[in-house]
A protein has these predicted regions:
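Basic, glycine/lysine-rich polyanion-binding surfaces/domains
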Residues: 1-175
């Protein structure tokens, strides 16, 4: 089972661990009800390093995203994020994803942990149409990126204290 860079911290701090999508993940520390209430009232930090990250790069990156995605990634600007799904072409959905536009030729897709391989294969197959090659314009960085999510009504205040040089108040939704 895979671990995240934060696993030693979780264990040191008494997390109850369980398997999810091939990862040993923290399920709770002090109790699910207490933690739920804390996040709803204040904030909480979640290890979401099990999520998948796939880079799509090059002059045909947007063409691929418009072909495989349910939303129009052409409406994104640098730093903007879009929620979308990957339709399977048969009336169903491969997965729901987040599309981050880094610049006009660089996008980062965040995909669900349980679907990384399925999403990767779907993107590689579709990428052939646009000359996008695995390991080059398409790159699965899922085992190289760790993520923490700060959620709750005080999340922005907490992150602002960690990043005092950034004016997070200027960020629009999904940026």
């Amino acid at each position: 089972m895979k671990t995240t860079p934060f696993t030693p911290y979780h264990i040191r701090n008494g997390a109850r661990m369980a398997g999810f999508a091939g990862y040993d993940m923290p399920i709770e520390f002090t109790g699910i009800n207490d933690e739920h209430t804390a996040v709803r009232a204040r904030a909480g930090v979640f290890d979401v390093s099990h999520m998948g990250e796939i880079w799509v790069k090059g002059p045909r990156a947007l063409d691929l995203l418009r072909y495989v995605g349910s939303n129009d990634a052409a409406s994104l600007y640098d730093g903007k994020i879009q929620y979308a799904c990957l339709p399977n072409g048969r009336g169903g959905i491969v997965d729901d994803i987040l599309v981050y536009r880094i610049d006009a030729e660089t996008y980062l897709l965040v995909v669900n942990a349980a679907n990384v391989e399925k999403d990767w294969n779907h993107l590689v197959a579709a990428g052939e149409r646009f000359g996008l090659r695995p390991g080059r314009e398409l790159y699965n960085a899922s085992d190289e990126i760790a993520q923490l999510a700060v959620q709750g009504p005080l999340a922005m205040r907490i992150v602002q204290r960690l990043c005092p040089a950034a004016d997070l108040g200027k960020l629009a939704y999904y940026t």
